[in-house]
Amino acid sequence: MLATLIIGLREGLEAALIVGIVAAFLKRSGRSLRPLAIGVAAAVLLSILVGVLLEALQTALPQSQQEALETVIGAVAVVFVTTMILWMRTHGRDMHHQLEARSEAALGRGGSLALAGMAFLAVLKEGFETAVFLLATMQAETSGALGLLGAVIGILAAGALGWGLYQGGIRFNLSRFFTITGVFLVLVAAGLVLNVLRTAHEAGWITIGQRQMFDLSWLVPAGSIRAAVITGV
């Protein structure tokens, strides 16, 4: 639950910031917010559909193929979170200016339709990453219901924070927030790597190094917060 909550909060706030920056630009320009709303709504619905389809596909597959699909999804999630953290460290400070420039270019190029498309692609990227990352993390959770609950709480909290930032009623250090959550996401990614190795073994893709050398499970009691942080799941 802790991992999915952090993922939902971080990814949700990134998406909320994108929407808020573009909305503020449109408001200052005296433009309608309708194209933005249409693009965002379409991206959110498509992201949810991707997650549902991946989960349905995995459930319909035989056990060995389920493990193979879990391995692929987990590996993709690790790549996503790694590139996301690196991108935020190098481009996070310029995100505001980049989005405003892209919004202005979209309006000049194709008006409302181009802006809706830009908003759709920007939010879809975040939504697709979130869907894959949450699915991979929930596969490693002992309780799927708790994992889903954590994701919902994180996304709702991100939406509330994003709205507060847009309205100007909430102010906090975004750089520090993304740094702290980035550390937790590195731990989550490390846990996903372990889960990818496990599912790859169960799928028959890895057949070496299977002998247990020692057991340190007593250091991280199952279900504890310490276990969630240390194992990344």
Residues of each region from the PLM?
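Multi-pass alpha-helical transmembrane bundle typical of ion/small-solute transporters
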Residues: M1-V233
